[in-house]
Amino acid sequence: MRHRCNVPQLGRPADQRKALLRSLTTEIIRNGTVTTTKARAKAVRSEVERMVTLAKDGSLAARRQALGYIYDKQLVHLLFEQAPERYAKRQGGYTRILRTVRRRGDNAEMAIIELT
């Protein structure tokens, strides 16, 4: 039972939710920006921040953790090369969520999440 677990459910079972967050994280790191729903953007923000923090650490253990989470191996190597100098003076807050127009079909709140 999930008593008082504050995990955003996103209307999916746990395995599908984990796969969704992994794929969104991979695409944000690859493209720098993704348009998605506001709830998904808020949920994926912590995962992206965690991956950038691992990349700033740069250790072998951190690299292996990132390889286990991000789907693209070359993307992990690129992240570990670029993140330490790009975010050297920043202690978190690597992403930004911008609200945008609602989705036409179901009027869902949409947002753009991007790396800063």
From Swiss-Prot:
GO molecular function list:
structural constituent of ribosome
User: InterPro entries given for it?
Assistant: Ribosomal_bL17, Ribosomal_bL17_sf
Q: Which UniProt keywords apply?
A: Ribonucleoprotein, Ribosomal protein
One GO term of the biological process aspect = translation
Q: PANTHER family given for it? A: LARGE RIBOSOMAL SUBUNIT PROTEIN BL17M (PTHR14413:SF16), RIBOSOMAL PROTEIN L17 (PTHR14413)
Q: Tell me, how does this one assemble?
A: Part of the 50S ribosomal subunit. Contacts protein L32.
Q: What is this protein called?
A: Large ribosomal subunit protein bL17
User: Which organism was this protein described from?
Assistant: Synechococcus elongatus (strain ATCC 33912 / PCC 7942 / FACHB-805) (Anacystis nidulans R2)
Q: What lineage is on file?
A: Bacteria, Bacillati, Cyanobacteriota, Cyanophyceae, Synechococcales
